[in-house]
C-alpha cells in the first residue's frame, strides 16, 4: 500500500512540474497558464501583455488583462479534476495562441482607426469575480469545454463566453479589457474608463437586469446584449456606479441590441391590436370600419385617405337613424320586409365603399363616395314617406323593383369609380343619384293618384326603361370619360323627370271614375303640389341648359325631342284610358 501511495505522489509531482513549465511558456506568450488550477485556495491577479507591433503599443500603451478570481477552499475534488485539464493543456495552448493572434490583430486595427479619431488614451478594466467551481486558465471553445468538463464550471468556458458576449457588442478582447495599472500612467488621459463586472447572478438580479434593459430604451446604444452561456450561468451586467457614464459613452463600444428592442416593439403593437379587438367587441360595425382603416394606413399611408374615413362612419350612423324613424312610422308587415331588403342593399353599398377607398386612395374619389352616402340617406327618407301613404300590395311589389334598380345603379357607380378615377366622372355620378331621388318622388305621387293595374304595369315598363338608360350612361362614361358626354347625361336624366311630370299631370287632369274616394282626394290634394314642383324642375332645367357651353342648336334639338316625346306619351295614355272609362 505504501508503495502505491508513493507511486501516486511521484506521478502527481511529475505532472505538477510539467504543468508549471507549460504555464511559464504560455505566460511569456501572453496566455493564461493552466498550472494555476492546482491551487484552489489562492486568490491570484495576473497581468499579461501582448505586443505584436511595438510602434502601436508603445504609442498607445500596452493593453493588459486583469482577472481577479475568488475561489472557494471547500471544493475538495479540484485536485483530481485538474489532472484532466492538464492532460488537455497541449491542445489548449495551440488554440489559445491562434485566438490571441486574431484578437491582437483586431486590437492593432482598432488602434489605427483611433489614431485619426481619438488621440487620447482610453483604458478599460475587466474584473471577473468567480465564486465556487474550478479554476482553469485557457481559452477554449465552450463546446469542447463541455465535453472535457462534466461539471461545466470551468473558468475557461466562462471567460470564452464573456469574450463572445463582448465581441457581439462590438468589442475585442484587448479593447474591452485594458489594464487598471495603466490608469496611473495616464493621469487624466482616460476620459471613459468603463468597468464591466461579470459575476454569477441570482434569479432576482436577472429580473432586475431585465427591467433595467427595458428602462434603457432611450439609451439603447449602450445596452449590453445579454445571453446565456453554454456551460455557465454568467450574465453581463453594468456596474451601478458607472452606469451613468455608460449612458453617455461612445457609440463604437456598445452597439445596439436590435433583437430586444424589436421584441419590445412587437409586444407594444400586439397590445394595441388587442385593444382594437376589444373595441370591435363593443361595436361590430365600428370594428369593421376600423379594420379597413388600419389596412389603408398600412398600404397607402396618406393623410387624405385617413381624413375621409370618419366621414363614411358618420354617414352610416345617419343611415341608421333614418332606419329607426322609418320603422317607427310603418306598421305593415309587408313593408317591414321591404325595409329588410333596403338594409341589405345599404350594407353592400358600405362594403363596396371600403373597397373603393382601398383600391383608389385618392381624395377626389373619396369625396364622391361621401356624396353617394348622402344620396342614399335621402332615398331612404323618400321611401319611408311614400310607404306610409301607399297600402296597395301591387304597389309594394313595384317598390321592390325600384329597390333592385337603385341597387344596380349603385353597383355600376362603384365600377365607374374604380375604373375611371377622374373628378369629372365623380361629379356626374353625384348628379345621377340626385336624378334617381327625383324620379322616386314622382313615382310616389303618381302611385298615390293611380290604382289601375294596367297603369301599374306601365310604371314597371318605365322603370325598366330608366334602368336601361342608366346602364347606357355607364358605358359611355367608361368608354369616353369626357366632360361633354357627362353634361349630356345630366340632361337626359332631367328630361326623364320632365316626361314623368307631364305624365303625372295628365293623370291628374283625367281622373278615372272607377277609382276609390281615397285616391281621388289624394289626386285633388296633390295636383297643385305636383304642378308647382313641375314648374320648379322645368325652370331648373332651363337654367342648367343656359349654363352649358354647347351650341344653341343642340339645346333646341333637346327641347324638340322632349316635346315630341311628351306628345307621344300623352296620346298613348289617352288611348289606354278611353277603353277603361267606357
UniProtKB/Swiss-Prot annotation:
GO cellular component terms attached to this protein's record: extracellular exosome
InterPro entries: Semenogelin
Chain intervals with Basic and acidic residues compositional bias: 50-59, 293-310, 336-345, 353-366, 396-405, 413-426, 456-465, 530-546
Intracellular or extracellular location(s): Secreted
Residue stretches of biased makeup (Basic residues): 111-134
Residue ranges, annotated region (Disordered): 25-65, 91-157, 171-192, 272-366, 393-557
Pfam families (alphabetical): Semenogelin
GO BP terms: coagulation; negative regulation of flagellated sperm motility; sperm capacitation
Composition bias type Polar residues, residue spans: 137-157, 174-192, 325-335, 427-437, 445-455, 487-498, 506-529, 547-557
Keywords assigned: Repeat, Secreted, Signal
Family: Belongs to the semenogelin family.
Subunit structure as annotated in this protein's UniProt entry: Interacts with SERPINA5.
Purpose: Participates in the formation of a gel matrix (sperm coagulum) entrapping the accessory gland secretions and ejaculated spermatozoa.
Designated name of the protein: Semenogelin-2
Native source organism of the sequence: Colobus guereza
Biological classification of the source: Eukaryota, Metazoa, Chordata, Craniata, Vertebrata
Amino acid at each position: 500500500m505504501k508503495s502505491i501511495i508513493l507511486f501516486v505522489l511521484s506521478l502527481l509531482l511529475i505532472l505538477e512540474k510539467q504543468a508549471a513549465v507549460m504555464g511559464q511558456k504560455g505566460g511569456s506568450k501572453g496566455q493564461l497558464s493552466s498550472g494555476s488550477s492546482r491551487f484552489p485556495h489562492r486568490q491570484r491577479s495576473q497581468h499579461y501583455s501582448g505586443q505584436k507591433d511595438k510602434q502601436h503599443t508603445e504609442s498607445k500603451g500596452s493593453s493588459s488583462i486583469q482577472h481577479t478570481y475568488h475561489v472557494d477552499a471547500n471544493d475538495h475534488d479540484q485536485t483530481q479534476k485538474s489532472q484532466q485539464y492538464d492532460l488537455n493543456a497541449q491542445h489548449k495552448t495551440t488554440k489559445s495562441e491562434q485566438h490571441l493572434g486574431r484578437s491582437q490583430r483586431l486590437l492593432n486595427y482598432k488602434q489605427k482607426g483611433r489614431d485619426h479619431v481619438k488621440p487620447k488614451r482610453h483604458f478599460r478594466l475587466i474584473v471577473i469575480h468567480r465564486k465556487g467551481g474550478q479554476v482553469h486558465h485557457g481559452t477554449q471553445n465552450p463546446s469542447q469545454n463541455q465535453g472535457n468538463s462534466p461539471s461545466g464550471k470551468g473558468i475557461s468556458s466562462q471567460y470564452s463566453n464573456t469574450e463572445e458576449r463582448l465581441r457581439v457588442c462590438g468589442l475585442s478582447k484587448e479593447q474591452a479589457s485594458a489594464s487598471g495599472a495603466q490608469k496611473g500612467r495616464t493621469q487624466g488621459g482616460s476620459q471613459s474608463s468603463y468597468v464591466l463586472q461579470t459575476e454569477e447572478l441570482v434569479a432576482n438580479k436577472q429580473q432586475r437586469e431585465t427591467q433595467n434593459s427595458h428602462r434603457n430604451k432611450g439609451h439603447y446604444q449602450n445596452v449590453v446584449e445579454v445571453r446565456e452561456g453554454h456551460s455557465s450561468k454568467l450574465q453581463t451586467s453594468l456596474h451601478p456606479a458607472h452606469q451613468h457614464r455608460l449612458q453617455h459613452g461612445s457609440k463604437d463600444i456598445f452597439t445596439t441590441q436590435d433583437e430586444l428592442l424589436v421584441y419590445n416593439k412587437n409586444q407594444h403593437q400586439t397590445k394595441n391590436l388587442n385593444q382594437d379587438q376589444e373595441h370591435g367587441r363593443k361595436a361590430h360595425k365600428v370594428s369593421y370600419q376600423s379594420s379597413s382603416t388600419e389596412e389603408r394606413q398600412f398600404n397607402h399611408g396618406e393623410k387624405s385617405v385617413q381624413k375621409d374615413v370618419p366621414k363614411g362612419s358618420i354617414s352610416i350612423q345617419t343611415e341608421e337613424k333614418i332606419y329607426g324613424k322609418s320603422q317607427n312610422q310603418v306598421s305593415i308587415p309587408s313593408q317591414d320586409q321591404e325595409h329588410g331588403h333596403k338594409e341589405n342593399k345599404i350594407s353592400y353599398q358600405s362594403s363596396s365603399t371600403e373597397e373603393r377607398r382601398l383600391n383608389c386612395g385618392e381624395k377626389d374619389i373619396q369625396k364622391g363616395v361621401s356624396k353617394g352616402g348622402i344620396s342614399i340617406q335621402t332615398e331612404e327618407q323618400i321611401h319611408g314617406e311614400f310607404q306610409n301613404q301607399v297600402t296597395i300590395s301591387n304597389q309594394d311589389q313595384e317598390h321592390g323593383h325600384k329597390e333592385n334598380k337603385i341597387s344596380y345603379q349603385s353597383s355600376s357607380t362603384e365600377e365607374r369609380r374604380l375604373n375611371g378615377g377622374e373628378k369629372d366622372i365623380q361629379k356626374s355620378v353625384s348628379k345621377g343619384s340626385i336624378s334617381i331621388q327625383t324620379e322616386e318622388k314622382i313615382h310616389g305621387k303618381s302611385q298615390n293618384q293611380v290604382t289601375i293595374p294596367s297603369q301599374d304595369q306601365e310604371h314597371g315598363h318605365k322603370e325598366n326603361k330608366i334602368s336601361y338608360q342608366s346602364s347606357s350612361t355607364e358605358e359611355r362614361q367608361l368608354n369616353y370619360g369626357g366632360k361633354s358626354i357627362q353634361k349630356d347625361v345630366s340632361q337626359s336624366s332631367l328630361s326623364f323627370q320632365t316626361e314623368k311630370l307631364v305624365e303625372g299631370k295628365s293623370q291628374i287632369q283625367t281622373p278615372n271614375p272607377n277609382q276609390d274616394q281615397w285616391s281621388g282626394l289624394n289626386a285633388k290634394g296633390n295636383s297643385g303640389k305636383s304642378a308647382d314642383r313641375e314648374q320648379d324642375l322645368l325652370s331648373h332645367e332651363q337654367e342648367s341648359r343656359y349654363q352649358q357651353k354647347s351650341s344653341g342648336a343642340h339645346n333646341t334639338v333637346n327641347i324638340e325631342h322632349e316635346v315630341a316625346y311628351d306628345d307621344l306619351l300623352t296620346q298613348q295614355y289617352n288611348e289606354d284610358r278611353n277603353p277603361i272609362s267606357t
